[in-house]
Amino acid sequence: MRSLIIAAALLALGGNAYAGGNAANGKAISEKVCAACHGVDGAKPAGPENPILAGQYDDYLVKALSDYKSGKRANPVMKAFADPLKKKDIEDLAAWFSSQKSSLHFQR
């Protein structure tokens, strides 16, 4: 019984579901797809209408990009960029941006 409780606690504290993204691949995708508006590292957007992505939680980034891709989140510009991305690309981008330093402090 004790082992079961410990296993459940480890699963609950074990991090998020998107930890498998590859940050190096995400950087390469970012350079091609995201850099013009958000900056390669996501910390220096081109304008105030573009959010800072650096340091954002990876699960939030996966959800946001997936929602743009599906149309659940309405933004025609982001939909156009998200449409060609595969699930793995989205996870890799999330790993890249979440690993970058940011001056912002994100709360859960």
Tell where the protein language model's regions lie, with residue ranges:
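C-terminal capping alpha-helices of c-type cytochrome domains
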Residues: 70-73, 82-108
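Sequence/structural segment immediately N-terminal to covalent heme-attachment motifs in c-type
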Residues: 20-41, 56, 106
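Cleavable N-terminal signal peptides
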Residues: 6-7, 17
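Positively charged n-region of N-terminal signal peptides that target proteins for export
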Residues: 1-4
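Gly/Gly-Pro-rich "capping" loops immediately C-terminal to redox-active cysteine motifs
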Residues: 27, 43-70, 79-84
